[in-house]
Amino acid sequence: MADAAIHGHEHHKPGFFTRWFMSTNHKDIGILYLFVGGFVGLISVLFTVYMRLELMEPGVQYMCQEGARFIASADACTPNGHLWNVMITYHGVLMMFFVVIPALFGGFGNYFMPLQIGAPDMAFPRMNNLSFWLYVAGTSLGVASMLAPGGGGDLGTGAGVGWVLYPPLTTTAEGGYAMDLAIFAVHLSGASSILGAINMITTFLNMRTPGMTLHKVPLFGWSIFVTAWMILLALPVLAGAITMLLTDRNFGTTFFSPSGGGDPILYQHILWFF
């Protein structure tokens, strides 16, 4: 024992990859949500700026079949309606499913709720990591959808169907696989949100510090708790709707087609319930 070495037990700082790609820490994951959400938000804002640039003057100056322009030109411009529809679609889909919900719920909720209720971390830290990377995978599919062949033929790529994804436009008019990728992107974002909601609810109910009754929880914690329940109950309904869109497109079902006994208005009921 005279030769025994004393080993230090001080904290070892993780490397960059370990911390930011494999983290289960609620603060790190909250920061990652905000970072990715901010990046996607920048893309979405650029879309709406481009649309407003086009609307600024009468006629069509920028969205041309000859090629998208960013500076007004005297050259001939044949209007490209498909590009306009793509801008509207992805601005809405990205903002709703990949910016607002992930940043405000996933980002701020992850970072602040455990701090406010005195919890050391989220109830399921490893599931928290899974939730984040499902969100990143969904974001990647959304970006891939913008670059995939759409229903505009030679007019360009992407699904120009509007952010609400109404049939029959989504089931019959958009022949390219950009629409399918967009549906899968929303699926993955929804799965991420459902896992996150389960995590938030469990953390709120089971991990409050001793003495913190429900009446003593800050209102921000309550807002995350209530939002988590709404996500948990409503998102599976939307998942069912877009799954029916997917099968109508690819497997010959007629959930939304009157020709096969389907109801074209059913999707709208389901979407606006969500």
Give each language-model segment a name.
Residues 2-274:
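Membrane-embedded and interfacial regions of multi-pass energy-transducing membrane proteins
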